[in-house]
């Protein structure tokens, strides 16, 4: 496990200064979710959703945190509004694929 952790750290270090534009389809999904659940300002993910809409060009480190959310969330027990405010499956698929491809690219 230590070698794998070191390997991921080295890959991430090569990408740390990069920024990425969130695709329109992901932003559109987040905007729709905010419109639908705009009254739920205390739900985890609300601030992130607003931040992503206002700042669609995100540093790699923020995308890693989003990936970590999806990697660790218990889909069977998560508040569905929270999950959607974090981007839902649209964001999950995009961020997983982006980070995987970027890590391959820098190897």
Regions found by a protein language model. Give the residues of each.
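Extended terminal accessory/targeting regions
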Residues: 2-107
């Amino acid at each position: 496990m230590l070698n794998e952790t070191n390997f991921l750290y080295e890959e991430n270090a090569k990408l740390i200064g990069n920024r990425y534009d969130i695709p329109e389809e992901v932003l559109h999904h987040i905007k729709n979710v905010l419109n639908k659940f705009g009254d739920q300002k205390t739900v985890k993910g609300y601030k992130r959703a607003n931040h992503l809409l206002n700042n669609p060009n995100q540093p790699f480190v923020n995308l890693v945190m989003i990936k970590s959310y999806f990697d660790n969330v218990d889909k069977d027990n998560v508040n569905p509004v929270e999950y959607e405010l974090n981007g839902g499956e649209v964001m999950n698929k995009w961020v997983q694929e982006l980070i995987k491809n970027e890590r391959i690219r820098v190897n």
